[in-house]
Amino acid sequence: MDLSITVNGIKFPNPFLLGSGPPGTNARVLAKSYDAGWGGAVAKTVSLESSKVVNVVPRYGKLRSRNNGEVIGFENIELISDRPIEVWLDEFRQVKKEYPNHVLVASIMEEYDKERWQELTRVVQDTGVDAFELNFSCPHGMTERKMGSEMGEHPDLTEEVTSWVKEVAKIPVWAKMTPNITNIKEPSLAAVRGGADGISAINTILSVIGVNLDTLRPMPTVEGYTVPGGYSSQAVKPIALRMVSQLALALPKETSISGIGGIETSHDAIEFMLLGSSTVQICTGVMLKGVKMVDELQEGLAKFMTDKGFNSVQEIVGKSLPYFSTHMDLVKMMKEAKRHKAGEAARDNEWAQKDITEKTAELTSN
């Protein structure tokens, strides 16, 4: 089955992309992902001065289910790429030469300086990459240099920096947005005003993964200390779905969305597509499951399309958006459907502590 989709004029063999991070940290791992069947990849974020980037060890932390030990949450305090830009430029050229039909998106980040943003845009663009993703959303480390989410949390900066890039970019530009904000629509719309062709959402959620009760130190612990980091994996998916749906309902129709956040299965990916994502990105899932997880993604999407009668991936995008409403309308529709008696169980005076779990199950839809 044809799983291709064209987004911002770029044809993706399928809608599944490696998300920016360790899975796209050099040409070798990018090549492995393409060989495995991924439709595209967003490389690890690059900047002009890698010497300022110093990563620490350990830099990851896991939140596990108390029932079976499964990883349901993942924190990282990893920074952007620490490899020289000159090395990246050579590898971008190499990857595009060897995989001309696979999409390569360059993630870029710089300090608040027009000349630096435009220089980075020019030199990376000359390598033949297919699109840019502007990292306005890394929540840790880089913010100390007024980078990452320090820009994405301020719509005026988001719009201005996007416009700087668009002045020199000849390829599509996506802006990657932070969830660490009250209203994700505001900076996203600002990026569109600045000329962004698409929005990627969401990046990780600022977090502390836990505290070691033996040492009393928060984790991940580096020489006895830590910093808050970015939270990802399964547990963030509902938050990401909410924000993606909000963006899909608010952005101009021509603005594409690349959905990110807790995607590990084809079921997850399809949910994002139904809520407006043309492509989906997976980073933590690949770190935990490996690049071969793309097999299930493709097989599951193809089966879903066959079962539901979809003729193209594009037909899926945004299909579930019309079913969002307001709470007042939900009450009205329930009453019109003569189901209001079923709702009586939700009244406060119907609840009793002895059967709270039973009442909870009674009012749950899945």
Put a short name on every predicted segment.
Residues 27, 82-89, 114, 155, ...:
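Electropositive phosphate-/nucleotide-binding environments in soluble metabolic enzymes
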Residues 44-46, 136, 203, 284-285:
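Short secondary-structure boundary segments
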Residues 259-262, 281-283, 289:
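Helical hairpin unit composed of two closely spaced alpha helices linked by a short loop
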Residues 50-67, 208-228, 286-310:
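C-terminal helical cap(s) of enzyme catalytic domains, especially alpha/beta-barrels
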Residues 273, 287-366:
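C-terminal extensions of enzymes
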Residues 1-105, 109-114, 118-119, 297, ...:
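N-terminal capping/small domains of soluble enzymes
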Residues 31-36, 40, 111-258, 267-277, ...:
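Alpha/beta enzyme core
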